[in-house]
Amino acid sequence: MEMKDILNRMLNHEELSREETRDIIVGITKSEFPEEQITALLTGLQMRGVTVDELLGFRDGILATGVPAILDCDRYIDVVGTGGDRKNTFNISTTSCFVIAGAGYKVAKHGNYAATSVSGASNVIKNHGVQFTDDIDKLNRSINEAGIVYLHAQLFAKAMKFVGPIRKALQFPTVFNLLGPLVNPSQPKCQLLGVANLDQMRLYNQVYQKLGIDYGIVNSIDGYDEISLTSDFKVTTNSYEKIFKPQDLGFEIAKPEEVRGGATEEEAKDIFDAVLENRALPAQKNIVLANAAFGIQVMEKGQKSIEECVEIARESIDSGKALATFKKFVEINRL
């Protein structure tokens, strides 16, 4: 593959095929292209917008060149946000994962260190003494015994390290910002994704339809890439598309300051702990319940009402099962 031919086609407003973008990733990992050409490619894609097939091809390439995580259970979910909403929320998706697991559903959480917030999923997990691993036996023990496994992105997506310096130098979002939710190395058949705007919701909706998985995509109308309860929020799934009010789930509207994750990693850790220990602010608990509930509904293939799923999530926290799940997870994965 000649990158100059790809760039010339893009200048002529041509789209790339899924196979071509897959091969681009493979070529990048083999150092076949100079940085200047990769920079031009990423800039051109960002200016015109990436197509569904192009995004899927990049995904295919990252998974093909990365380390797989083959789990010996069939049905599990990942709850993740695209990031980049610059709202610095507490670790809502990560906390929700332990609530879902505490309710008896299997979870394979894929995450990384913070990029635009104080504390990302990997920060809060590591700050509890957890050691990241790609050892498949340990990963399977975690999901089978604790009901949840954590997959630290940097151990699996080898292609990302090749483009890291270029992404940092560009100082604007690229197609790689869209790929994080799509490259979970365990390739879950269920996913709850939070996006920061409706354009992303439409894009991922088409991507998930092509992948054939069970999914829910959520966006708070005021710009959060999760259900923040600070405003109405939109949900798109395999079977419905609807705008909800917080009151529809029995929750009060939250204030923006109640969603924030604190100024330090330690403050973010304290909020995470408080939710699982059932001593958080009511708004913080409600936000996690809302996100966990839609994740549970995805796992149930939409067969349970969202009201039922909220109560399942609530019981996970109130009974102490979410906290017990987290403690078991830490015990298995301790440094």
Where are the regions a protein language model picked out?
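Glycine-rich anion-binding loops and their surrounding alpha/beta cores
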Residues: A64-A69, T89, G104, K126-T133, ...
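Short, flexible segments with low predicted structural confidence
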Residues: H13, D72, S96-C97, F176-L179
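A generic, well-ordered mixed alpha/beta core segment in the N-terminal half of proteins
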Residues: G81, D85-S142
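Short amphipathic alpha-helical face segments that pack within enzyme cores
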Residues: A40, T94-V99, I287, N291-F294
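Short loop or secondary-structure boundary microenvironments that flank
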Residues: L45, G111, G194-N197
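Alpha-helical scaffolding segments of alpha/beta enzyme cores, especially the outer helices
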Residues: D23, G57-D60, T95-F98, P165, ...
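Acidic, glycine/proline-rich low-complexity segments that act as flexible tails and inter-domain linkers
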Residues: M1-T89, A103, V107, A254-V259, ...
